[in-house]
Amino acid sequence: MIKILCSADWHIILHKKKVPYDWQVNRFREMFRKLIALEQSCDVHIIAGDIFDKKPEPDEICLFLSYINSVTIPTYIIPGNHEATKKGESFFEYFTQENAIKNENVHVYTRNGRASVGEANFCFFPYGEMQNNNLPQYVGGDILVTHIRGEVPPHVSPEYDFSRLAPWRLCLLGDLHFNHRYGDTDCYYPGSPLNTTFDRDANRQYGVDI
């Protein structure tokens, strides 16, 4: 059986006001060290969007590349809403250009697509495709990877009809920052591995999924 490492919502940002720069860099580097350690016992790493908090600065890109060019297992990335430039588009398109990422283990999907790792088949449904209502066709046995905001009562409403994802036996999602199964669906959020601008809730779990 394949072992999947799933993370999302890193929100790399290095220029928050009144926060020491070195501290901001070092917490991401520590996260990268832990991810590299975790991948040693996994077969594939799925990153379900929002790696960056906004359009990145050069040092934020370099920090990301320092990790992504070091991964040792197949790693698949889709963009999330924080990487969108306009409806249906993402600045992650630039990372798909030749030599942008030099690690052959890394694959970026800014459009719908499929990939196989061992006996597992993945279907990628990036945020921009969700915005354009371009749900991919279901293929039996696929694991869906997407980035969609679900409901968090009483103030956060879902941005998509989750019943449309029902054919997939497993859905790995980014967007919501706490680790949980979404209702009675087969959709799972790993949550954000690091604190963001949102406060932590002591009654919820955070991190990554394996």
Regions found by a protein language model. Give the residues of each.
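A structural signal for the main folded, soluble domain(s) of proteins
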Residues: M1-I2, R27-R29, K34-E39, G128-N132, ...
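N-terminal active-site segment of His-dependent metallophosphoesterases
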Residues: M1-L63, Y67, L135-G141
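Hydrophobic/aromatic beta-strand patches that form the interior of the parallel beta-sheet core
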Residues: L5, I46, Y76-I78, Y109, ...
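Active-site neighborhood of divalent metal-dependent phosphoester/pyrophosphate hydrolases
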Residues: A8-H15, C42-D59, P74-K87, D142, ...
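Catalytic phosphate/metal-binding cores of nucleic-acid and nucleotide-processing enzymes, i.e., regions
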Residues: I13-V19, R33, F64-N69, P74-T75, ...
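Metal-dependent catalytic neighborhoods of phosphoester/phosphodiester hydrolases
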Residues: K16-K18, G49-Y67, A84-N103, V156-D161, ...
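Conserved catalytic scaffold of divalent metal-dependent phosphoesterases
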Residues: E83-R164, D186, P190-L194
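Conserved beta-sheet core of the metallophosphoesterase superfamily
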Residues: E151-I210
